[in-house]
């Protein structure tokens, strides 16, 4: 079982405290940066396809906007917490600052499981999230994006709702849109490729050739799939990937000593990156149970 006492936000604060000590940061700056500037907890009532009404909990955390509008994704996950969203918003502040992008850190989420929701129900959650937060987000304040179990389709629903509320065209409200609606080419691959490009530069510094490395990947969604593709292009070998099994409600690792076949695994995975373990065994993968 996972350790329920673990706090991502406490870990993020500890990381900040260590860095602040090294930098000799003054006390007022520390007190400001250790906590979010603003955070919102919302309730989203949705009429389900069967006629019942469910209320979904949602969040948006704006950690810091000193360098520009807050920026960060929206996560749909059944175990989403405000604590996790706080940590991710803080990390977004540091990531934008480190690469000198004039944006601050934000993050959002909804406690829900898209596996068990119809397209219409997911659309209503997206639109409800925007309606609740429309006065506190936008191109000059806070720009959302896709994240865990959200896609360009979710962003399009949110954009449409925001434009309906404001009564004007607002393409800068959200990123990760379909290319035909103002999205960016390469957005789908960017996060996974970026992770591997960072790894490539680190290996250069260490004098290690990618072809001499072996890796395991946690997750098999959009980010991991593109990261695995690029890592293998560089010559690296991936022996193991792990992902969540929705039916068993636990994670499994899929291992093959001589390296996985990415196209093969893509052929037996669902749209969320969940791998069919029976088919994986038939293809010669060792299936190892992980955390529930």
Can you name each region flagged by the protein language model?
Residues 2-43:
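Short, Gly/Pro- and small/polar-rich lid/capping loops
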Residues 15, 84, 194:
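Charged catalytic carboxylate motif
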Residues 16, 20-27, 89-96, 126-141, ...:
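Structural signal for hydrophobic packing residues in well-ordered secondary-structure cores
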Residues 36-37, 46-48, 62-65, 107-110, ...:
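Glycine-rich beta-alpha junction loops
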Residues 42-114:
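Glycine-rich, N-terminal phosphate-binding loop and its surrounding beta-alpha-beta segment
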Residues 77, 97-211:
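Glycine/serine-rich phosphate-binding loop and adjoining beta1-alpha1 elements at the start
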């Amino acid at each position: 079982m996972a350790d329920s006492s673990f706090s991502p936000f406490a870990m993020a604060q500890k990381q900040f405290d260590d860095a602040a000590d090294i930098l000799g940061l003054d006390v007022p700056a520390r007190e400001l940066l250790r906590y979010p500037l603003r955070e919102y907890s919302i309730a989203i009532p949705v009429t389900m396809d069967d006629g019942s009404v469910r209320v979904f909990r949602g969040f948006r955390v704006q950690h810091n906007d000193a360098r520009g509008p807050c920026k960060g994704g929206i996560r749909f996950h059944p175990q989403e917490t405000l604590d996790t969203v706080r940590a991710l918003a803080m990390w977004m502040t540091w990531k934008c600052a480190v690469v000198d992008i004039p944006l601050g850190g934000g993050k959002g989420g909804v406690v829900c499981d898209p596996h068990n929701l119809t397209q219409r129900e997911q659309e209503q959650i997206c639109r409800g999230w925007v309606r609740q937060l429309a006065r506190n987000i936008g191109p000059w304040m806070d720009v959302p994006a896709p994240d865990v179990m959200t896609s360009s389709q979710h962003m399009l629903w949110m954009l449409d709702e925001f434009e309906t509320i404001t009564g004007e065209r607002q393409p800068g409200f959200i990123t990760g849109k379909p290319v035909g609606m103002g999205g960016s080419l390469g957005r789908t691959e960017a996060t996974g490729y970026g992770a591997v490009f960072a790894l490539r530069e680190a290996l250069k510094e260490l004098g290690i050739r990618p072809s001499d490395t072996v890796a395991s990947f946690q997750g098999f969604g959009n980010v991991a799939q593109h990261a695995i593709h690029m890592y293998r292009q560089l010559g690296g070998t991936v022996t193991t990937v792990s992902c969540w099994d929705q039916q068993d409600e636990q994670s499994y690792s899929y291992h093959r000593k001589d390296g996985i076949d990415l196209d093969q695994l893509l052929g037996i995975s669902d749209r969320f990156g969940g791998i069919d373990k029976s088919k994986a065994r038939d293809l010669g993968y060792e299936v190892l149970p992980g955390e529930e």
